A protein has these predicted regions:
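Glycine-rich, flexible N-terminal cofactor/catalytic loop recognition
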Residues: 4-75
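A contiguous loop/helix-start segment that scaffolds small-molecule binding in enzyme catalytic cores
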Residues: 9-11, 19, 94, 172-255
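Short active-site oxyanion
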Residues: 43-49, 121-124, 173-174
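Short beta-strand scaffold positions
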Residues: 51-52, 108, 177
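Alpha-helix capping/helix-boundary segments
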Residues: 55-57, 102-103, 132, 182, ...
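Glycine/small-residue-rich loop that forms an oxyanion/phosphate-binding "nest" at active or ligand-binding sites
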Residues: 71-74, 82-131
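Conserved helicase motor
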Residues: 73-79, 153-156
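Class I SAM-dependent methyltransferase SAM-binding "motif I" and its flanking Rossmann-like core
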Residues: 112-170
Length: 255
């Protein structure tokens, strides 16, 4: 006697009702496998996807066989594009906002658009996902709460030095994005200001050559001076005073 056919059980929650609005979708920061099922569902159902760089986003969409209309939304055209997108939402469309990696609006384009959509009284929905900031913080081994995120460090060396000096005096962990072309200069500044201060350089997060280089600012500077890094970089700087459990001299965990 044949066994009865096996069917998948009904989902515990019904699929989300598709209504007009702006959906802010976090995308992978390196590993395409990190995209969430909900993000894929929202992308597949979008009437329009506004992305930082269409060439970058199309690679993600092609990987998951998603074919939806795209427009660019970046720092150069956001003010002009925002009214167009608001008109699409008012007309009944579901518009998705993505950046090249991670959460849109956070050190990426989109905050002016979101402000305008909120001001217009229209729906804004966030689909969370990968974050370079939280990934670097969680893997740093430094205190995670509280923390300060300063976005990209200043391009000019003088302004960058001022930012780094402030970070060294904070009572919390500080996190910044930095370019591989400036990281050696940045580490040199840190080594000059506080050579024994604990820092972490997180590089190529979630990718094949992911690296966490931990140590004093002097040792990390020396490491990368000998072998300049490539790829996306997140810099994590320890607070001015480390808690007892995280002190380099600590030998036993607190009870």
């Amino acid at each position: 006697m044949l066994a009865p056919p096996c069917f998948m059980s009904e989902p515990t929650e019904p699929p989300p009702i598709r209504v007009p609005g702006l959906r802010i979708v976090a995308t992978p920061i390196g590993n395409l496998g990190d995209v969430t099922m909900r993000a894929l569902e929202v992308l597949r159902s979008a009437d329009l996807i506004a992305c930082e760089d269409t060439r970058h986003t199309i690679r993600l969409l092609q990987h998951y066989q998603i074919h939806r209309p795209l427009i660019s939304l970046n720092e150069h055209n956001e003010a002009r594009r925002s009214p167009e997108i608001i008109d699409r939402v008012r007309a009944g469309d579901s518009v998705v906002l993505v950046s090249d990696a991670g959460m849109p609006t956070v050190s990426d384009p989109g905050q002016r658009l979101v402000h305008a959509v909120v001001k217009a009284g229209l729906l804004v929905e966030v689909i969370p996902g990968p974050s370079a900031v939280l990934t670097a913080l969680a893997g740093s081994g430094l205190p995670t709460m509280p923390f300060y995120f300063g976005g990209f460090l200043a391009h000019k060396k003088g302004a960058r030095g001022t930012e780094l000096a402030a970070a060294l005096q904070r009572e919390c962990t500080s996190i910044y994005f930095e370019s591989p072309y400036r990281i050696i200069s940045t580490l040199e500044i840190l080594a000059g200001l506080a050579p024994e201060h604990q820092i972490v350089v997180a590089r190529e997060l979630t990718k094949r050559f992911e690296e966490f280089q931990r140590g004093t600012s002097q040792s990390v500077f020396q490491h990368f001076s000998a072998k300049p890094p490539k790829g996306e970089i997140t810099l994590v700087i320890a607070p001015r005073e480390m808690p007892k459990w995280a002190s380099p001299k600590a030998t036993e965990p607190e009870p």
